[in-house]
């Protein structure tokens, strides 16, 4: 849909708006864009630069106060269709970005971020405090953030790496990958997709990973103290290290590693569950990909 919009409006993007406004510390940026792109980068200046490519029929409005800078577009013929924003902000500035047919990207932020779109990708590097990223029909990707992390998609994948803090990730039809995670509270849920968690298991922490039709692969550090409960109806369980199963029934069992102060819940209805040491999951993935590649070559 984004490609279609860009194709139809490509010739109309003839107008350029480039405005810089001063801002005070603590101000927030709000941008709403029906279609196109919102790309945010950072600099050391106490100012916001808004560069926009848009139709000559559109007008970019900027409402700046001590607390907030609001950016939106208006057209003489109803709502603007496609606007591509390139915005530069102070690194610590809080961001509230939204759109419909809109790709959103942020690079180098050290502030709170809220980004939400319907049909478009969300790709963020950075973020401190509350970081909430959502897309209905688009991938959600986050790296190098710390704080309270909330990631959501409906029909695409979620990827997070180099994250510190509480993490919640949820999608319906997509995989979830959480790698290099430093967290005492992590949760991931999907219906049709695989989940990978390669991160810390902290004493007293809570971790829950659930999928209906997909596999779970979770890393457990060697010195972890965790009580593990496993539930799978139509799948296998395996571990790269010895475990002593207790309370075993046909579809559910548990075991304890170390003192068991953390809790880890694993659920998959139609999928396998595998535990390994940190870093081992990537090796397993590479091994499986090489195996599938060799099989494809044999079939050819």
Tell me what each language-model feature is.
Residues 1-300:
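Intrinsically disordered, low-complexity terminal regions
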């Amino acid at each position: 849909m984004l490609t279609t919009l860009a194709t139809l409006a490509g010739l109309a993007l003839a107008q350029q708006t480039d405005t810089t406004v001063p801002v005070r510390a603590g101000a927030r940026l709000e941008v709403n864009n029906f279609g196109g792109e919102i790309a945010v980068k950072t600099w050391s200046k106490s100012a916001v630069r808004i560069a926009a490519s848009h139709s000559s029929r559109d007008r970019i409005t900027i409402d700046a106060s001590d607390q907030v800078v609001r950016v939106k577009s208006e057209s003489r013929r109803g709502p603007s269709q496609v606007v591509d924003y390139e915005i530069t902000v102070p690194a610590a500035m809080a961001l509230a970005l939204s759109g419909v047919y809109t790709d959103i990207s942020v690079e180098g932020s050290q502030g709170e971020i809220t980004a939400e779109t319907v049909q478009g990708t969300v790709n963020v590097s950075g973020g401190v405090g509350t970081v909430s990223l959502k897309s209905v029909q688009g991938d959600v990707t986050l790296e190098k953030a710390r704080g309270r992390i909330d990631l959501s998609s409906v029909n695409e994948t979620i990827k997070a790496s180099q994250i510190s803090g509480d993490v919640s990730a949820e999608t319906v039809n997509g995989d979830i990958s959480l790698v290099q995670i430093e967290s005492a509270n992590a949760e991931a849920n999907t219906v049709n997709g695989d989940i990978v968690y390669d991160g810390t298991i902290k004493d007293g922490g809570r971790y829950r990973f659930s999928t209906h039709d997909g596999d779970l692969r979770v890393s457990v550090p060697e010195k972890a103290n965790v009580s593990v409960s496993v539930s799978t109806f139509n799948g296998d369980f395996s571990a790269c290290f010895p475990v002593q199963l207790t309370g075993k029934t046909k579809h559910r069992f548990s075991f304890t590693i170390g003192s068991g102060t953390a809790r880890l819940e694993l659920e998959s209805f139609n999928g396998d569950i595998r535990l390994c040491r940190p870093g081992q999951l990537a090796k397993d993935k590479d091994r499986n990909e090489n195996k599938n590649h060799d099989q494809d070559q044999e079939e050819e």
